[in-house]
Curated annotation (Swiss-Prot):
ATP binds at S218, G219, G220, V221, D222, S223, T224. InterPro entries: Class_I_gatase-like, GATASE, GMP_synth_C, GMP_synth_GATase, GMP_synthase, GMPS_ATP_PPase_dom, NAD/GMP_synthase, Rossmann-like_a/b/a_fold. HAMAP family: GMP_synthase. This is GMP synthase [glutamine-hydrolyzing]. It comes from Pyrobaculum aerophilum (strain ATCC 51768 / DSM 7523 / JCM 9630 / CIP 104966 / NBRC 100827 / IM2). GO terms for molecular function: ATP binding; GMP synthase activity. The active site is at C80, H164, E166. The gene is guaA. Its EC number is 6.3.5.2. GO terms for biological process: GMP biosynthetic process. It comes from the Archaea. It holds the Pfam family GATase. It is an enzyme of class 6 (ligase).
Amino acid sequence: MEKVLVVNFGGQYAHLIARRIREVGVYAEIASPEEAVIKASKEEVKAVILSGGPSSVYEPGAPDIDEGIFALSKPVLGICYGHQMIAKKLGGKVERGKGEYGKTIVKILVNDPLFDGWKPEEAVWMSHSDFVEEPPPGFHVLAISENGYIAAMRKGLIYGVQFHPEVHHTSKGRVMFENFLRKIARISDVWRPEDQITRIVEEIRSRVKGGDVIVGVSGGVDSTVTAVLLYKAVGQRVKAVFIDHGLFREGEPEEAASLLKSIGIDVVYIDAKERFLKRLEGVADCEEKRRIIGETFAEVFSDAVKQMPNVKYLAQGTLYPDVVESGAVKGADKIKSHHNVGGLPPWFQLELIEPLREFYKDEVRRIAKALGLPEDVVYRHPFPGPGLAVRIIGPFTREKLAIVRKATKIVEEELRKAGLFRKVWQAFATVGEDKWVGVKGDRRAMGYIVTVRIVESEDAMTADWSRIPFEILEKISSRITSEIPEVTMVTYAVTSKPPSTIEPC
């Protein structure tokens, strides 16, 4: 299978690049700079893309790459930091300037296949302070920005662009990728996530030679698809375990068990609510909550494994963003720990299987549809592994848990009524320690402040707050304050990711 190698220089944009390439129908694989030359040398790799990154090419310890990457006679496209790395490595000059941030107009100077379908001037997205002052010998400048910076350059099959074609703010970014992949790299293969089902099933079957596979299910699309793929591969050797930690959305445990049973997968239900909730009581720190939930989950899982002596494998629904947000990709900053990533406790002694590790959420949904799963599962909003605990800011209490659960149900119900639920990435409520004076039943009342968070995204790597009509927000607010006596104020979160994260904790 023909593929593109995306070299990750530490920025989370590397995954956005990979997604955009896959959207064009070409498989993209991410590699660290240290392994780039070896991986790029493989015959199936038809092109290399050097990602952006948070560093300066002149900083001590900044990500670097072997110049051999340019001697492979394969098309190379450097983006932002990758563009500057090309200049530095091949004899150009990189300087620090005022930079460009946000929407910028670039002017195309030369007709080039990379810009087929572009107008003479197009809007792009810039995010840089360093810039290429002089291109390397033999390079031609293809485009400049409205501020006079080199926006694109080329020598033979080596291209560099200062802007970010992978973000939607670059209006013709997808067209550029199509040009680079199909016209310059001449890649003809067409890759689709739903076409990978047979391969995934065969890979699982080849790995699970003997023994059973245990998989934790939650009702979400990731764990459900994982369980179904396992079932297709090894049948009744799949042992699905639903651990009820008491932190799920309303009705979720029952729905999850019912669905899997209808497919033919037996589900072992473990009621561990008290075990989790007692340990969380009063805990305020976000990472401490995640640690407690992760460790308790592992303990409960371990107890389950002990009751299944033939279990030799543990399957998880880990996705690409899970990996990058946990800092598992070299050069990426750790944002928050993820309960699915970071290794297994030593007492598990199980081999880990992650059938979805190479996919993004939208690709998993496409696989789910191809597997024939119900639309309620396919389009279920992402839900954090630690559950509603990370939507409680400050000390954890059962009172706050009940508030968040009820408020989230109201948010989801109103969005469904308005036909907006599937149009947003996530929608939920959070609660903290702050309180607000209110009036209920003609009497003064002191109640909690609930914050509603609704975001739009494609992959959770970046997200924008959703411009929900005011009348919908008004209904949500009215219902929350009317139906949850402990709440006197509802606010709406209007910060995007970055600088914020989607979840509050």
